[in-house]
Amino acid sequence: MSNPMRNPKVEKVVVHMGVGESGQHLVDAEGILETITGQTVVRSYAKRTLPAFTIKKGEPIGCKVTLRGEAAEGFLETSLGIVEKRLNESQFDIFGNVSFGVEEHTDYPGMRYDPNIGIFGMDITVVVNRPGYRVSKRRIAKRKIPTSHKITKEDTISFFKDKYAVEVE
C-alpha cells in the first residue's frame, strides 16, 4: 500500500492453554508454555462455578502468555508452520483477529513427549491492527477509530496471505 498508516501489523499474539483444573496438571502446562514461548506465564481463573466439571469460581484453570514485537512474529511463524500455513475463513473475525489451535505441544521444535506430563494443546489468538489505533486506547484525548481506518476480515486475510503465505479455505 502507498500509505504507511494503512498497512496492517501484528499487535500481539496471545497463547492460551485451558487445562480445566488446578494442581500439578496446571503447573506442568505452565512449564511447557514457558519453555515454548520463553516468557513468564500468567494464570487464568474460572469466572463462575461449574458443578458438572467440579470447577469453583476463582480457581486457576489455565495459563496464558501475551507476546508482542519480534517474539510475537517469530512465534506466529512457527505456529503457522505447525498448522501447515492453512487457516479456515471462519477463524477470522470481523475485527481483524485470528484464532487457531495447535493440538500437541510436541509439534514445536525442541519439545519432546514426556509420559509423566502428557500432551497439551493450545489456542493462539492474533490481534491485527493498523498504526494509529493507540488513539482509541490512550488515557488522555481518547478518540474513536473512524470506520474507514478500522481493519476488516478481508484486510486481515489479505495481510496473512501476503506476509505469511497462508492458504485460507
From Swiss-Prot:
One of its GO terms (cellular component) is ribonucleoprotein complex. Coiled coil: none annotated. SUPFAM superfamilies: RL5-like. Keywords: Ribonucleoprotein, Ribosomal protein, RNA-binding, rRNA-binding, tRNA-binding. GO terms for molecular function: rRNA binding; structural constituent of ribosome; tRNA binding. GO terms for biological process: translation. Pfam families: Ribosomal_L5, Ribosomal_L5_C. InterPro entries: Ribosomal_uL5 (IPR002132), Ribosomal_uL5_arc (IPR022804), Ribosomal_uL5_C (IPR031309), Ribosomal_uL5_CS (IPR020929), Ribosomal_uL5_dom_sf (IPR022803), Ribosomal_uL5_N (IPR031310). It comes from the Archaea. Belongs to the universal ribosomal protein uL5 family. Part of the 50S ribosomal subunit; contacts the 5S rRNA and probably tRNA. Forms a bridge to the 30S subunit in the 70S ribosome. HAMAP family: Ribosomal_uL5_A. This is one of the proteins that bind and probably mediate the attachment of the 5S RNA into the large ribosomal subunit, where it forms part of the central protuberance. In the 70S ribosome it contacts protein S13 of the 30S subunit (bridge B1b), connecting the 2 subunits; this bridge is implicated in subunit movement. May contact the P site tRNA; the 5S rRNA and some of its associated proteins might help stabilize positioning of ribosome-bound tRNAs. This is Large ribosomal subunit protein uL5. The gene is rpl5.
